[in-house]
């Protein structure tokens, strides 16, 4: 289930403050964050946010289509290496 509409969207305060400072100064810097739970607001559009995936920070460029989604959706935490291939030698 999603978040209740009466509660509204959530974003960490420290992330919002960093975005506001960059918007007032018209700067474009990469913002490192561990907050995968934060919702993307329209003020985030045009910025690059480096979201932590458990090993490293993955740079995510925010576009208008991403508004309303969570930051963690764009930084996958698991790497899929594929299923084991057929071993042709053991079939003989």
UniProtKB/Swiss-Prot annotation:
PROSITE patterns: RIBOSOMAL_S19
GO biological process, any: ribosomal small subunit assembly
Keywords: Ribonucleoprotein, Ribosomal protein, RNA-binding, rRNA-binding
Database matches in InterPro entries: Ribosomal_uS19 (IPR002222), Ribosomal_uS19_bac-type (IPR005732), Ribosomal_uS19_CS (IPR020934), Ribosomal_uS19_SF (IPR023575)
Gene Ontology MF terms: rRNA binding; structural constituent of ribosome
SUPFAM superfamilies assigned: Ribosomal protein S19
The keyword Ribonucleoprotein belongs to this UniProt entry's keyword annotation: yes
Any GO CC annotation of this UniProt entry: cytoplasm
General function of this protein: Protein S19 forms a complex with S13 that binds strongly to the 16S ribosomal RNA.
Family matches, as PANTHER family: RIBOSOMAL PROTEIN S19P FAMILY MEMBER, SMALL RIBOSOMAL SUBUNIT PROTEIN US19M
NCBIfam families, per database record: rpsS_bact
HAMAP family per record: Ribosomal_uS19
Family of this protein: Belongs to the universal ribosomal protein uS19 family.
Protein name: Small ribosomal subunit protein uS19
Organism of provenance: Oceanobacillus iheyensis (strain DSM 14371 / CIP 107618 / JCM 11309 / KCTC 3954 / HTE831)
């Amino acid at each position: 289930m999603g978040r209740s509409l009466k509660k509204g969207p959530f974003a960490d305060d420290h992330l919002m403050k960093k975005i506001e400072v960059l918007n007032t100064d018209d700067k474009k810097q990469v913002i490192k964050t561990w907050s995968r739970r934060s919702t993307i607001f329209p003020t985030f559009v045009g910025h690059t946010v480096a979201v932590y995936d458990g090993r490293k920070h993955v740079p995510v460029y925010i576009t208008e289509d991403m508004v309303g989604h969570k930051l963690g959706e764009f930084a996958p935490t698991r790497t899929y290496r594929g299923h084991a291939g057929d071993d042709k030698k053991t079939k003989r």
